[in-house]
């Protein structure tokens, strides 16, 4: 997981998973991620989870994905997002391709007009620790008096995979 400044405004920090390096070709076909024409291995985790997606909470499937370099992580999908089939993304020189682990509710490199390919100069550093975690709708985040019901203490200070 990497912290970077979004290319759109060069100010907003995003934390996303680094998926593609310069020269890599990425594509999503029927919800499956392909890296350099190789389908990324994905193993379903049998327990569905609830996630926040804008103003609604969705029950989604989670998967362990394994990149060609052996790196494993958990990603969630609901198979109803708008990015189930994409054109090929070819990562330019000195740029990187990022995706959120919450695939169907993530603004990331797949959205070329708002995030797109991230230049090396926009990289801030590696995210290594979950400092704070709560389970609220984004609109409720600023209502701190409701946090006691939604704080996920079990995730505090966990190492990010």
Predicted segments — roles?
Residues 1-161:
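Soluble "head" domains of membrane/secretory-pathway proteins
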């Amino acid at each position: 997981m990497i912290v970077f400044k979004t290319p759109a405004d060069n100010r907003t920090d995003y934390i996303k998973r680094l998926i593609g390096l310069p020269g890599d070709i990425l594509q999503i076909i029927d919800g499956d991620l392909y890296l350099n024409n190789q389908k990324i291995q994905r193993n379903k985790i049998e327990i569905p989870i609830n996630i926040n997606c804008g103003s609604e909470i969705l029950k989604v499937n989670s998967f362990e994905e394994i990149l060609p370099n052996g790196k494993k992580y958990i990603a969630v999908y609901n198979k109803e997002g708008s990015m189930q089939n994409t054109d090929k993304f070819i990562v330019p020189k000195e740029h990187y391709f990022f995706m959120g682990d919450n695939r169907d509710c993530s603004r990331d490199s797949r959205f070329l007009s708002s995030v797109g390919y991230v230049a090396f100069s926009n990289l801030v550093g590696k995210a290594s620790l979950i400092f704070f975690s709560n389970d609220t709708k984004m609109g409720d985040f600023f209502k701190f008096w409701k946090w006691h019901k939604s704080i996920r203490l079990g995730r505090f200070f966990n190492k990010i995979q």
